[in-house]
């Protein structure tokens, strides 16, 4: 349908250019706004004419009528639809037969590649997301970050880009030493294996324990952790050995959560391996005169050209800042995998940080610094409010997943399906993943959100499990058709998309036809919620079609055949769109 819409856009632009006359610059198709009418009875596409009416000295309604007359005389366009003047708009009723045939042919020819576009063909795009600390497990904020980063990576790859997913592991600094300090003092040699606690949670428990210790003995705690940090900086072998052990524990558990939620990376970077490069670059910038040094030997950058004040890049004792390691990491990445664009998926509390980071890298003379982009997103909380790792009030990602899994199991048991389903445990896990990812991705990334586990698991309405239910229902229908064919033999009926003219069929065909444009729009806006919104629209269109248009009990074989083809097309697009937003497709539920 997008091709037909563009065809009409260019046809309208061509006629507008004729009306303007040769003395005026021709109208380009891209200048024409194309909208979807609010009601089906008003057509399929609409062109507002307010802007162009002034150029030809007519009212918008007069211009719409004249355009309609001229386009009706264009026999080459008559096969693709009918123009109609609607006040200040030129509306077009597309040729249903043409759109249905074109859309279904494209879906069956391309299969699960349908929707793939060339928008980013040839581009190399690196995506950074997750960025965990090795002193605690992943929490709900990481779940939103991971979902956005992984989904966005899949979407831009589907638009033709070569995508490289990276993760910076924050494995050094005061916060890491806090867990190490508490472990040294209070663990008495315990390990995750001894306690049966998941390894990242085991490390996180010591981070909480340190903060309890610091509340009781603040001076001693401050001294202990600073001493540990200095010994780490000096490469004390005993401190480094403990650091490696606890980091390995934390990272092992974090990787298990990644695997559980379908998150993967092409390369991991570690702050402990990049911060020294950042320090070297800051000192080089000082030597080049782009930074300046204070009397205490700390190094700063002037941000007045950004409308800001100044920013410290290196402390007076030569120790690094948070921004220092990001400078080094960015340089290593550009060397490792030269990119056309690097997207940082990081929460909006870091907006200032990335504005400064990109500016600093430009000052250092790196041309690729112009290609850095911060994909900022809002905070996510649970209904009981904000969470704090140091107080132990954070709800781990695994806790949320376990809770969703248990609730999905209960729902399966409630429906009496646990015995009928061969892999009920696996299905419950996939339902939990669908509930989580759809809920996190249905909100525009820029907005703050509250994650409601119970709402996310609903099998009715705008949820991941509902989409899975729809997919399973379609699969069940097609399986039954296949069984009938095997028993009775195939029907000698030609499937003709031209028969799909019922209003519910037409709305479903148009929904399928819009998918490629939705993928491109999601990539352009770095916004997976475009796809989740599309899936909700598709599910509503299918439900209406399923209710209004009989399939198995349709007495006319040719109509039944055409509708079955439409159902098959829906399954293909549904599966593809669900994959882009990390929702497992289920054949049965």
Swiss-Prot record:
Name of the protein this chain belongs to: Arginine--tRNA ligase
CDD domains: ArgRS_core (cd00671)
Localization (cell): Cytoplasm
Highest rank taxon of the organism: Bacteria
Gene3D superfamilies (UniProt xref): Arginyl tRNA synthetase N-terminal domain, HUPs, Isoleucyl-tRNA Synthetase, Domain 1
HAMAP family in the record: Arg_tRNA_synth (MF_00123)
Catalytic reaction list: tRNA(Arg) + L-arginine + ATP = L-arginyl-tRNA(Arg) + AMP + diphosphate
MF annotations from Gene Ontology: arginine-tRNA ligase activity; ATP binding
A Gene Ontology BP annotation from the UniProt entry: arginyl-tRNA aminoacylation
Family (UniProt): Belongs to the class-I aminoacyl-tRNA synthetase family.
EC number of the protein: 6.1.1.19
